Amino acid sequence: MFQKILIANRGEIALRVLRACKELGIQTVVVHSTADSDAMHVRLADESVCIGPPPSRESYLNIHQIVAACEITGADAVHPGYGFLSENAKFADILAAHNITFIGPSGDHIRIMGDKIEAKRTAKRLGIPVVPGSDGAINDEKEAKRVAAEIGYPVIIKASAGGGGRGMKVAHTEADLEVALQTAKSEAGAAFGDDAVYIEKYLEKPRHIEVQVFGDGAGRGVHFGERDCSLQRRHQKVWEEANSPALNAEERSRIGGICAKAIADLGYSGAGTIEFLYENGEFYFIEMNTRLQVEHPVTEAITGIDLVHEQIRVASGGGLSVRQEDIKFNGHAIECRINAEDPRTFTPSPGTITHFHTPGGLGIRVDSGVYSGYKIPPYYDSLIGKLIVHGRNRVECMMRLRRALDEFVVDGIKTTLPLFRDLVGNPDIANGDYDIHWLEKYLAKDE
């Protein structure tokens, strides 16, 4: 087991990883920018190292400074959390060159899954169902029209190096295709420095289903069930559930088994999430995230297994602590992402939290690094906390969530809490009857 882990992140996930390390008896080092010197994870860590000014590129994305912090403190492993350098293959390779363990997959696997075209090819080879579309990058408009005609309209054009909805355009007819292609390539080039795009069939009313997987790097793989992340705004997840209200046990077992086998065959090590669009009983691969997800706590709630403990164990060479038959699903869990944003316009709302009170009681968990008097810096993601609620079934979970949201108090800034209080009273949400477009349509009604 590791002696000392450096946590290369900030906010709630840095505190989440720190807690896991302390439970395992591992010393902790956190790195931070000058804007985060009073953050909770900095206060609680055994050691902290300031690695630069507030801009991420000069601090949390500064590989040289993070490696230097490892060497200064004697850290033998790095946990990247999510975001920042968590899916940076170069970072993983540099750590390996310095004999420091990256708590995650190999640089090669990060590269494969980071290239959306190569990821789709790999998924197809591993037996994962994929969306009909081009085999690789689209070179010109003529090829785009040919592929679109073969798979049928509407189609969606996606950036090969993309994510978060950037470089993504829908064409409903051939007349739309030229503009959509040019716009997607332009956006992709500007956002990612790579204008390669590919085409897929556009699904009209899909759900977003993702499967949590783990590999030991030696040919074993397991799945921890699925999460439903269909409530989204501009391709950003807002509310997540486990398990999905749309799947039955047979579908869950089938897609989970496919994913676990794929991870084993790939020789993958650590945590990963295989994301799908789900429509009319069929799954279609979108991408694989080679890191811990923001929404991992809902999986922990229904399985009772600490996924960060599992990450650390696998990375240290201890292998998986569970077999597939050991993983049981109990009850239902929902996570709400509490952001420092206007609940209607979603504009950021940095500032000082004058009062912060979290809900409690059976089945309630709050992952947050903020506190009363904390000043939210304007430089980073607006997530200030996650409310995770577990119940014996979805009905109990929703009732408990309603109560927890009523108890949650954040004063001094605007947050998305009012949005969630509205959602828990909506009949569609109560029935689990929603798709990836539902939330944007709901919000548009109030504009």
Indicate residue ranges for each PLM-predicted region.
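ATP-dependent carboxylate activation and anion-phosphoryl transfer catalytic cores
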Residues: 7-16, 20-24, 48, 71-73, ...
